[in-house]
Amino acid sequence: MALWLTVVIALTCLGGLASPSPVTPSPTLKELIEELVNITQNQASLCNGSMVWSVNLTAGMYCAALESLINVSDCSAIQRTQRMLKALCSQKPAAGQISSERSRDTKIEVIQLVKNLLTYVRGVYRHGNFR
């Protein structure tokens, strides 16, 4: 009986170790959200109204956003965001390559892209779809 009880306790403990644990949010993703909030709070015209190509944030959002923002020059406000996106982007776009995530016919202001990215990343963070 004692042996049987020991086996049951051991299996219970091992079962607890094998059970799936909750997915913890990426600290980088949380930092990105905080940075995007900081950028959008007091910026009526971010980067002097620079325009960037609109991107499809549902397909490779970090790389697509980075690729769109990488061509913005003389805008220190988004440099930290660019570094964070580089860390989150698993693929490096080739020079001169036109991404499938980018819509070449639509340009939007940098502030609008940042707001769109913030909305999308908040949703990803909220629903736990970490990539």
UniProtKB/Swiss-Prot annotation:
Domain of life of the native organism:
Eukaryota
Asked if the keyword Signal belongs to this entry, the reply reads: yes
Q: Which Pfam families match?
A: IL13 (PF03487)
**SMART domains tied to this protein:** IL4_13
- The residues forming the signal peptide are 1-18
PROSITE patterns for this protein: INTERLEUKIN_4_13
Name any one GO molecular function.
cytokine activity
- Looking at the keywords, is Acyltransferase present? no
List the carbohydrate attachment sites. N38, N48, N56, N71
Q: Which Gene3D superfamilies match?
A: 1.20.1250.10
Q: Which UniProt keywords apply?
A: Cytokine, Disulfide bond, Glycoprotein, Secreted, Signal
SUPFAM superfamilies, per database record: 4-helical cytokines (SSF47266)
UniProt GO BP: immune response; inflammatory response; interleukin-13-mediated signaling pathway; macrophage activation; negative regulation of complement-dependent cytotoxicity; negative regulation of endothelial cell apoptotic process; negative regulation of inflammatory response; positive regulation of cold-induced thermogenesis
What InterPro entries has UniProt attached to this entry? 4_helix_cytokine-like_core (IPR009079), IL-13 (IPR020470), IL-4/IL-13 (IPR001325), IL-4/IL-13_CS (IPR018096)
Q: Which cysteines are joined by disulfide bonds?
A: C47-C75, C63-C89
Main localization category:
secreted
Q: Which family does it belong to?
A: Belongs to the IL-4/IL-13 family.
Function of the molecule: Cytokine that plays important roles in allergic inflammation and immune response to parasite infection. Synergizes with IL2 in regulating interferon-gamma synthesis. Stimulates B-cell proliferation, and activation of eosinophils, basophils, and mast cells. Plays an important role in controlling IL33 activity by modulating the production of transmembrane and soluble forms of interleukin-1 receptor-like 1/IL1RL1.
Q: What subunit structure does UniProt give?
A: Interacts with IL13RA2.
What is the name of this protein? Answer: Interleukin-13
Q: Name the species this protein comes from.
A: Canis lupus familiaris (Dog)
Lineage of this protein's species? Eukaryota, Metazoa, Chordata, Craniata, Vertebrata
Q: Which gene encodes it?
A: IL13
